[in-house]
Amino acid sequence: MTMVYANIFLAFITSLMGLLMYRSHLMSSLLCLEGMMLSLFVMMTITILNSHFTLASMTPIILLVFAACEAALGLSLLVMVSNTYGTDYVQNLNLLQC
C-alpha cells in the first residue's frame, strides 16, 4: 500500500470516527458523510487510473451523483428540522416522539 492510498484510507477512517463520535448534530454528521464520499471517490479514481481499467471509468462519476443526491437530501432534512425545532439535533428525527 503506497502512501497515497494510506492517506486516503486514513481520511476515510477519520471521517468514519467523526461520524461515530459526533453524531448528536445533523450538520456534523453530514460533513463526515461528505468526507467519506470524497475519500471513496478519490480512492476509486486513483485505483481505476492505475489499473487502466477503462470499462469502470464511469463508476466514480456515478458515485459523485449519489453523493450529490445524498447531500441535497441531507441539507433539505437539516433545513426542515432546524425550521421545525430550532436546533439540528439528531434526536429530533425520532418519529416515535410525541
Curated annotation (Swiss-Prot):
Its EC number is 7.1.1.2. InterPro entries: NADH_UbQ_OxRdtase_chain4L/K, NUOK/Mnh_C1-like. Keywords: Electron transport, Membrane, Mitochondrion, Mitochondrion inner membrane, NAD, Respiratory chain, Translocase, Transmembrane, Transmembrane helix, Transport, Ubiquinone. It is a multi-pass membrane protein. One of its GO terms (biological process) is ATP synthesis coupled electron transport. It catalyses: a ubiquinone + NADH + 5 H(+)(in) = a ubiquinol + NAD(+) + 4 H(+)(out). The chain crosses the membrane at residues 1-21, 29-49, 61-81. GO terms for cellular component: mitochondrial inner membrane; respiratory chain complex I. The keyword Electron transport applies. GO terms for molecular function: NADH dehydrogenase (ubiquinone) activity. It comes from the Eukaryota. It is found in: Mitochondrion inner membrane. Core subunit of respiratory chain NADH dehydrogenase (Complex I) which is composed of 45 different subunits. Belongs to the complex I subunit 4L family. Core subunit of the mitochondrial membrane respiratory chain NADH dehydrogenase (Complex I) which catalyzes electron transfer from NADH through the respiratory chain, using ubiquinone as an electron acceptor. Part of the enzyme membrane arm which is embedded in the lipid bilayer and involved in proton translocation. This is NADH-ubiquinone oxidoreductase chain 4L. It comes from Ommatophoca rossii (Ross seal). The gene is MT-ND4L.
